[in-house]
Curated annotation (Swiss-Prot):
InterPro entries recorded: Acetolactate_synth/TF_NikR_C, ACT-like_dom_sf, Arc_rbn_hlx_hlx, CopG, CopG/NikR_regulator, Ni_resp_reg_NikR, Ribbon_hlx_hlx, TF_NikR_Ni-bd_C
UniProt-recorded name of the protein: Putative nickel-responsive regulator
Species per Swiss-Prot/TrEMBL record: Anaeromyxobacter sp. (strain K)
CDD domains: RHH_NikR_HicB-like
Family membership noted in the UniProt record: Belongs to the transcriptional regulatory CopG/NikR family.
UniProt cofactor(s): Ni(2+)
GO process annotations (BP): response to nickel cation
HAMAP family from the UniProt entry: NikR (MF_00476)
Amino acid sequence: MLERIGISLEDGLLEQFDKLIAEKGYVNRSEAIRDLIRDALVQRAFTESSGREERVAVVTLVYDHDSSSLAQKLAHIQHENHRAVVSALHVHMDPHNCLEVLVLRGRGKDVVAMGESLVATKGVKYGKLVPATAGHDLG
């Protein structure tokens, strides 16, 4: 069952939001707001868990493979945590830059620790840890 709610936004904020949802292909504001709420709930569940529950996350990394031993450092972290690495994708973006996408699974605190360790490795140009969920509690 859907329940109708009302919100108040400044004109400029609403204009920016409407542009954003149009660019992303949302049919209406409601679906975009539902996605924002779901994302916030997944983030909260991931960070507020006791750390013992099994969690799944995706880590995205961009780095220069010519950077001094960086690829080896990243591989070492993955090998140290090999049970948590479900899948890894490596893409050569250009002659120097690589994209790695890792799917991690394990105890929440272990997944977060590994993901943060990879993202914080010196030489990583861009890194992000994104929690995932099966959506059982999202309605």
